[in-house]
Each structure stands twice: as C-alpha cells, then as structure tokens.
C-alpha cells in the first residue's frame, strides 16, 4: 500500500517541481507585467496575464489588481478549490464507471443446438470488449477532459479556448509517458507483462498518433488558423471509424476472413469468447430470439459462429477444477476456519485473479484513495455474511413454528418375531408446549395379519403440558412356522388440543389446525422378521451413491426371513473404476458374525476425499456364502487365538457343522485345523436322515437378491455447491454495482480499510488506517451528495450513466473556471495551466488504476493498452464535438471559426514525435532479453521509466518555452 500511495505522489511532485521551475524562469516577466492593465492583455500573447475573464459559472473576483498578499491568498483558494473539485469528479466518475461496467456486462441468452439435436442454453455478452473499451470505457475515463473542452467552447460564445484542447493534449502526454513509466517500474523485478491483443494495440496506437497529426494538419496545413465545418465533423466521425478498425482487428474480419473461429466459454467472466482453429466437420448451431445463426444467415458475435460445445464444457470444467484447487489449498492452509470464512477467502482470491476491465481498476483506485476500502474484500465478506444470515434465518423459522406437529420419530420399525412387543415413539414439536394435545393411533394389516402375526391395537396418546415424546407398544405373536418377513401399519389421526374455552376442554376440529396438526411421517411401517430360519443375507439395494467427503461409509447387511443361530458372512471390496490401496478407497475384507436374533450388521469402508469438482468412480462390495456357526466352532475360534488344536467335524447334508474340539497337551507354534469329511454322498439315506436333511435345507442361511453392491463415489455436494456459487459470482458488475439508495448511503458514510500487503488473510477484519480516515472525511461530502445518483440496478445502469455524466459536466465547468482564474491570478497562460495542473488532476485516478492493473493483471492491456485508445478518443470526441459545434454555429452566422495554431500545433507536433519514441521503446521491450512491455530486469525497468519521465519533462519544458515565446512555434 505504501508503494501504491507514494508513486503517484512522486509523479505529482514532478509536476509541481516543473511548475516551480517554470515560475522562477519567468519571474522577470511576471514582475514586469504586474502593473499591466486589462486592455494591455492583447499586446503581449507571449506573457501571462493577471487580467481574469468571467468564467462559465464563476464570476470575476474583484478587484482585478490585488496586492501581492491577496494574490497569494486568492491563488491558494483557487488551488484548494480546484483540488477539491478534482476529488468530487473522481468520486462521481467512480459512479459513472460503475454504470458503464454494468452496461457492458449485459448478457443475452442463446440456445445451442448440438449435432445430436439436443439443445442447451447459455449466455453471451452483448458488448464486444474492444468496442466497449473504446467507447463507454474511454468516455468514462476521459469524461472530464472531453466535457471541459465542450463546455469551454459553448460557454464562451463558441470561441476557441486554450484550456480544453491543451488539457486533452497534456492529459495524453501524461498518460503516454508518466503512467506507462509508472507501470513499467511497479511490476516486481524479474516479472514481465505483455500486451495480449497486440494488433488492437497497433491500431489504437496508430489512431492515437494520427489523431494528433490530424490536429496539426487542420490547424496549420489545410486551412491555417481556421477550422471549417467539414474538418470538425470529420474529426468527430474519425471516432466511429477508429472503433470499427479496432473491432475489425480484434475479430480478424479482413485478413483472417477465412480462418475458422471457434467460441468457448471464458473462464473469468463466464462469457463466450473466440479463438481460431481448424474447421470441424460437424457444426453446432446457435439460436437467439428464435433465429438460427450461422455464417450464411447472420453475422452474429462478430463473425461466423460455430460453437464447440465439447470444448466449452472442457473450459468450464477447467474453471471448476481451478475453483476446487483454490478451496483445497485454502482448507489445508487454514484448517481452523469455518466454511463461511473459506468461502470468503476463495471468493476474494477468485475475484483477484480474474481479468478485469479498465472501469473496474478505475473504480478500485478511486475507492482506495477516498477511504472506501477494497471493493473485492467487501464483496467477499458480504457474500459470506449473507450465507450465514440465510442459514440463521432458516434455522430460526424452523424452531419457532407456531403450530405443534405430531409425528412418528421414524417411518419404519423392525422387530423379531419373538420380541414380544415393539415400541413406537411419537414426537411433538413446535407450538405452545403448555397445551395438552391428544392424538389417536390405530394398527392396520399389511402382509401381516392381526391376531396371527400381531395384536390389533388402537387408542389415544395424551401429551401433557411440557411433554414432547410418548411411546406406544404393539404385541407381536411368535410361531414356529417358516415364513417371509411381514409388515403392518400404524396410523396417527384426529389431533385435538385441550382448551378451557370449551365446556369439555377439547377444541373443536375447525380450531385445531391453528394450534396442532399431524406432521410427517404420520404413518409408521413395522416389519416383523421371522426367527425360525437362519436368515437370508442381502444388501439393502444393488447400487448406492456416496459423497467422497463421507470419510467412513457404512453399508448395512440385512438378515431377513429369520434370525436363528449364529452365522458368519464373509465380505470383501473389489476395484472398479475406483482404485483401492488408499487412492480412492481403502481395501477392506473380513467377516461379519450375526448373533442369534441379530438382523443387521454394518461394513465400514474408508473413502478417500481428494475434493474433485466432478467425480463418478465405482467399486464393489461383495458378500460371500454364509455359514452357520455352532457354539463348538466359536470355542474353536477362541482357542485358535490361544494356539494349538485340531478340529474334527463332518459335513451334514452339504453344510459344515462343527462338533468337537480336541485340544493338545502342548500347543504347537502353528495352528493346524483338520476337518474330516465323514459323510459319503454315495451312502443311501434313511427316512429319518432324509427328514433331517429337508429341515436343515429349509433352515440353513442363504444369500439373498443383492449380494454385490455397486458403490458410486461422487463429488461432495457441499464442495460442488460452494464451487458453483463461486463460479456464479465472478461477474464484476455485481461487485461494483449497487442495488438500492440505502446501500449507497451506507457505503457513503462508512470508512473502510484500504489495501494491505497480506492479501491471503483477507478473511480477517482490517481496521482503517489514518490515511483512510483522513481521505474519508475530506470526501464524505461528495460521497453523500453522489449517493443520490440512481443505483446501477435501475434501467440496467443507464439511469446512473445519464445522471453521472450530467454531474461530471457541472463539476467540469467549475474546474475550468477555477483553473483559468488560478492561472490568471499567478500570471500563467491557460495552455500552461491546462497542460500541468488540469491534466494532473484528471489523470490521478487513471494513474492509480494503471498501477493496480500492472501489478495484478496477467497482461498489460488493462494498464497501458487502453492509454492509446483513450488518447485517440479524447481528440475525436473532446475536440471533434466542440469544434464541430462551434464551426457550425459560426458558419450559420456567416463567420469563420478561428483557432490560433501556434501553441496547440507545437504541442501536438512535440507530443507526436515523443509518442513515436514511446511506442518504439515498448515494442523493443518485447524482445526475449526483456520479455514484455512492462517489468523485466531492474536495470531495464529503471532505464525505461527514466526515459519516459524525461520525455514528459521535455514536453512540458518545450511547450512552456513556446507558450512564452522563448522558442518559435508554428
């Protein structure tokens, strides 16, 4: 932050030193002209004048010939007022740029037709980025200079002035030399920034130099000293021509007409952008407003549009993976933080990394200067607070339900046939707990029948004041018959509330719903498991889905149709697309031992969470053939742990039944288990043995329908939801825009912390610095005043746009009068005042914005690429509009619009020469030794920055010498 604040201050110091040197070099002229009368002003155009003219708004400060002390006082007042007006213009320009960001971020929905006939919908930006940069963005950045030129001409009876044109040229020089010098220097040593859209830079740079060359041509070559109507209009019409050329260069419509262009979703803004490639054989058509768009029908999105859906999906996936990576890194770096804090950190980091417009950097710079804080951090914190608030509101609503709800604790209950009774729990939640609530219950047959499988039960449950839970019991009838699992239902009905208002103490039915009602579930299903069979073992379902963040997943193995005896069921995991060994899950195998009457066991498998945005991997969990275990086998297994024994047994009708355990006197190191098969299949069975076999076959444990469970590992829902929320919040128009006047007034009176060096800790609350407080109190008047400007939510930003530009025009009129009166008070010509002071005041926000863009952006386009385009727009709009109006006015009156070519033509020529040097140096820096227009080795940075600062000082020096006739101009 220290560097951010000192470097622009250093450039301001250069300005002031230049002015001081200029004043001292002309002290003899100023002293000689101290006694000059007003009428002598025309006798010497080469000297400054103490005779002030009436401004567009401000009157003359009488008397015209004050004492030396009064001059110092007046100059101080004018200077302070001018600086304060510059602060006001910066703040209203902030609102203006916010509206432009919202306007240029407008989207339109389109329908994408895939080759297979499927259609999906997506959005595209309406405004082309290059067009918006050269039109609305440039207008927002240069509105004070443009309006100053127009207001000066219109406010002085359509006569040419020096303040407006000189401000435009001076601002162009400051932008081209000082701002670029600063951007070159602030990039960290060893890092570089290159211009990404070089062809657009070439076009705008060429038009920028041409604009000032054109000024010289119409002032000194075509019609010296006179601006004709066609010259003014042509100057203005060069503006749309420049925009079209830049757009053509950006879209390659001339030289790249036959190069196939594909469109994909941009990672940063969620928009569809274009790149080149080979034309595929299949096309994807796009519909907008019901019309199919292709290269033969329409010229949508600046050219032939064939959208590669698969590639767009890949880019979306890449963006989501990047979001997921950021969240994982933050979670590892800050394990102690809650999810809301991690969302805030991730949101801020995502917003910081994405590509931003010139408007955003201008807004960010202004708010940092005026104590309004870092808008990215404020936005991230607001989003996190909103998420917490919504959670708290939902929780509070659920807990404060005014109606008592009566329902079963769970919708399903299970019991064994020999359990005697089954207990069902009824819950009372919400409402007034001081009331007494009555609810009826009644059993109903399902596959189980009352009287043979369970006891029919009905009654009324009474919840006394303060009671929230009651229990009812239903009798279960046991038998010795093998049968399938059966179920019956228990219903709740007829909720009543006790009240003293009625004679019987019970509310009428039509009054009950306001105090109590049935909740969900109001019906419970009771399943009776048969206990006369060893059981059928199965999973609940063939497929299950689990989140990768589950940690330990538990899978139930059910024992149905009986629960008699102890049974061992082996299980194991099998790899599918998911890999074991700790990559996607940990390999698991073992045995489940079901005790007598035990009907469910769980298998635990550890799932590895690698926090992928999208995941769909499978593995399998399989159970093996169950086997019945008698007590003798359990003893054998226990002795096995002690060591040394031999098991002898026999197969009974195909099933291993263990009978005896013979322990050795002296245990041996290795356990040896010998199972002797005593049953011979060839031996005929007696009738008794046949009956025993039939009964054993009927009662043995078997596998059920689902013996192999497919486990599908999916991404974490919470993790994916968080990433999706971050994806949706990357539109910067939501960050800089406002939704209500209330929001604007709160923001206006709130002082926030500015930039800091520890960006990673943005989740921690930062206190405003002394600088933040000072700047806030200096600018709070402007903040509150401009809070009356309509929010950017209205009319899609156009209401804010119109009101803001009117406010800028009013303040610019004041600035023009103050600058002119300040100059005449100290004896400076308007051309010098404009080049130095006014150009400085209007360029300080751009200086901060370019510095931030140079350090944060991956490319140099946002920091210096727009400087050249802005310079061209200043001439074509600022001078073109003003001179066109004046030329038409004078032509209508049969007069000529006269403009003195001297100072302006000289400044324009000087600037053009230096601009060629500037552009040449920037292009040379793209060589591999340096690597880019900005940054590079420290020595190269210093030399480049010093050269550009020297060019600006020479421009100021020679322009001032020519203005005071020390050197001859044109």
Curated annotation (Swiss-Prot):
Q: Where in the cell is it found?
A: Cell membrane; Cell membrane, Sarcolemma
Q: Which residues form the signal peptide?
A: 1-32
List residues in topological domain: Cytoplasmic: 93-133, 189-201, 250-797, 843-871, 925-941
List Phosphoserine occurrences by residue.
Answer: 282, 389
Topological domains (Extracellular): residue ranges? 33-71, 155-167, 223-228, 819-821, 893-903, 963-970
Record: residues binding Ca(2+) 5:
548, 610, 612, 715
Residue ranges annotated as transmembrane are: 72-92, 134-154, 168-188, 202-222, 229-249, 798-818, 822-842, 872-892, 904-924, 942-962
Q: What is known of its domains?
A: The cytoplasmic Calx-beta domains bind the regulatory Ca(2+). The first Calx-beta domain can bind up to four Ca(2+) ions. The second domain can bind another two Ca(2+) ions that are essential for calcium-regulated ion exchange.
The record's function comment reads: Mediates the exchange of one Ca(2+) ion against three to four Na(+) ions across the cell membrane, and thereby contributes to the regulation of cytoplasmic Ca(2+) levels and Ca(2+)-dependent cellular processes. Contributes to Ca(2+) transport during excitation-contraction coupling in muscle. In a first phase, voltage-gated channels mediate the rapid increase of cytoplasmic Ca(2+) levels due to release of Ca(2+) stores from the endoplasmic reticulum. SLC8A1 mediates the export of Ca(2+) from the cell during the next phase, so that cytoplasmic Ca(2+) levels rapidly return to baseline.
Concerning its family, UniProt says: Belongs to the Ca(2+):cation antiporter (CaCA) (TC 2.A.19) family. SLC8 subfamily.
Name it: Sodium/calcium exchanger 1
Which organism does this record belong to?
Canis lupus familiaris
> What gene makes this protein?
SLC8A1
């Amino acid at each position: 932050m220290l560097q951010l604040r000192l470097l622009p201050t250093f450039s301001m110091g250069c300005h002031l030193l230049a002015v001081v040197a200029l004043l001292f070099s002309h002290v003899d002229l100023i002293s000689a002209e101290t006694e000059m009368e007003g009428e002598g002003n025309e006798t010497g155009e080469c000297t400054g004048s103490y005779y002030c003219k009436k401004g567009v708004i401000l009157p003359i400060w009488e008397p015209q010939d004050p004492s030396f002390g009064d001059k110092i006082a007046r100059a101080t007042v004018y200077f302070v007022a001018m600086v304060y007006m510059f602060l006001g213009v910066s703040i209203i320009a902030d609102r203006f740029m916010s509206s432009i960001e919202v306007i240029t971020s407008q989207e339109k929905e389109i329908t994408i037709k895939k080759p297979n006939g499927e259609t999906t919908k997506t959005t595209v930006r309406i405004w082309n980025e290059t067009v918006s940069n050269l039109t609305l963005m440039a207008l927002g950045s240069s509105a004070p200079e443009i309006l100053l030129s127009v207001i000066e001409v219109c406010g002085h009876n359509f006569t040419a002035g020096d303040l407006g044109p000189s401000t435009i040229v001076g601002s162009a020089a400051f932008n081209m030399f000082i701002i670029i010098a600063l951007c070159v220097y602030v990039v960290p040593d060893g890092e570089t920034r290159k211009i990404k859209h070089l062809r657009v830079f070439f076009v705008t740079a060429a038009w920028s130099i041409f604009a000032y060359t054109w000024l010289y041509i119409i002032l000194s070559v075509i019609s010296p000293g006179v601006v004709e109507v066609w010259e003014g209009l042509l100057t203005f019409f060069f503006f749309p021509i420049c925009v079209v050329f830049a757009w053509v260069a950006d879209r390659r419509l001339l030289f790249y007409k036959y190069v196939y262009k594909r469109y994909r979703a941009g990672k940063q803004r969620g928009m569809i952008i274009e790149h080149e490639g080979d034309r595929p054989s299949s096309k994807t058509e796009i519909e907008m407003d019901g019309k199919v768009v292709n290269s033969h029908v329409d010229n949508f999105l600046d050219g032939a549009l064939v959208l590669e859906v698969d590639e767009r999906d890949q880019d979306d996936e890449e963006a989501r993976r990047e979001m997921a990576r950021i969240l994982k890194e933050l979670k590892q770096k800050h394990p102690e933080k809650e999810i809301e804090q991690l969302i805030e950190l991730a949101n801020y980091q995502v917003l910081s990394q994405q590509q931003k417009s010139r408007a955003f950097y201008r807004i960010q710079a202004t708010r940092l200067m005026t104590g309004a804080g870092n808008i990215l951090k404020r936005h991230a914190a607001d989003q996190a607070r909103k998420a917490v608030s919504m959670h708290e509101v939902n929780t509070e609503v659920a807990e404060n339900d005014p109606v008592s709800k009566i329902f079963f604790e769970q919708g399903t209950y299970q019991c064994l046939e020999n359990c005697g009774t089954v207990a069902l729990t009824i819950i009372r939640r919400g409402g007034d707990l001081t009331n007494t609530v009555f609810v009826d219950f009644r059993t109903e047959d399902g596959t189980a029948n009352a009287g043979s499988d369970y006891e029919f039960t009905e009654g009324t449950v009474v919840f006394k004041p303060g009671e929230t839970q009651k229990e009812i019991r239903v009798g279960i009838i046991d038998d010795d018959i093998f049968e399938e699992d059966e179920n019956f239902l228990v219903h709740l009905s007829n909720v009543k509330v006790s009240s003293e208002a009625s004679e019987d103490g019970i509310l009428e039915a039509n009054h009950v719903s306001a105090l109590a009602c049935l909740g969900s579930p109001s019906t419970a299903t009771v399943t009776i498991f048969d206990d006369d069979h060893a059981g059928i073992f199965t999973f609940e379902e063939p497929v299950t889905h689990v989140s990768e963040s589950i940690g330990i997943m538990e899978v139930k193995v059910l024992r149905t149709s009986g629960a008699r005896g102890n049974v061992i069921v082996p299980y194991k995991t099998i790899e599918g697309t998911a890999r074991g060994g700790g990559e996607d899950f940990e390999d698991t195998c073992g045995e489940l031992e079901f005790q007598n009457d035990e009907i469910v066991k769980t298998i635990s498998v550890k799932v590895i969470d690698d926090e992928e945005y999208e995941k769909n991997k499978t593995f399998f969990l399989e159970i093996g053939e169950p086997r019945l275990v008698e007590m003798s086998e359990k003893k054998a297994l226990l002795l096995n742990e002690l060591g040394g024994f031999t098991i002898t047994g026999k197969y009974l009708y195909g099933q291993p039944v263990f009978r005896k355990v013979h322990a050795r006197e002296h245990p041996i190191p290795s356990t040896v288990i010998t199972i002797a098969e005593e049953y011979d299949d060839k031996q005929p069975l007696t009738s008794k043995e046949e009956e025993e076999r039939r009964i054993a076959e009927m009662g043995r444990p078997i596998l059920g329908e689902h013996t192999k469970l497919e486990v599908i590992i999916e991404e974490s829902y919470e993790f994916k939801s968080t990433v999706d929320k971050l994806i949706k919040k990357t539109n910067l128009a939501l960050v800089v825009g406002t939704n209500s006047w209330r929001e604007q007034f709160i923001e206006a009176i709130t002082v926030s912390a500015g930039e800091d060096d520890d960006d990673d800790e943005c989740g921690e609350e930062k206190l405003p610095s002394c600088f933040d407080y000072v700047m806030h109190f200096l600018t709070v008047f402007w903040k509150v005043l401009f809070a009356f400007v309509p929010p950017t939510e209205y009319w899609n930003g156009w209401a804010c746009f119109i009101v803001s530009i009117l406010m800028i025009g009013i303040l610019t009129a004041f600035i023009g009068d103050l600058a002119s009166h300040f100059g005449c008070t100290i004896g400076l010509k308007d051309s010098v005042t404009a080049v130095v002071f006014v150009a400085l005041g209007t360029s300080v926000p751009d200086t901060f914005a370019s510095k931030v863009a140079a350090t944060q952006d991956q490319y140099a386009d946002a920091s210096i690429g727009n400087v050249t385009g802005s310079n061209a727009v200043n001439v074509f709009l600022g001078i073109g509009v003003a001179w066109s109006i004046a030329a038409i006015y004078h032509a209508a009156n049969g007069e000529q619009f006269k403009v003195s070519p001297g100072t302006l033509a000289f400044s324009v020529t000087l600037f053009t020469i230096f601009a060629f040097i500037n552009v040449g140096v920037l292009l040379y820096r793209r060589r591999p030794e340096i690597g880019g227009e900005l940054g590079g080795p420290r020595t190269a940075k210093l030399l480049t920055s010093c050269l550009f600062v020297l060019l600006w000082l020479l421009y100021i020096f020679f322009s001032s010498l020519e203005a005071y006739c020390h050197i001859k101009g044109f």
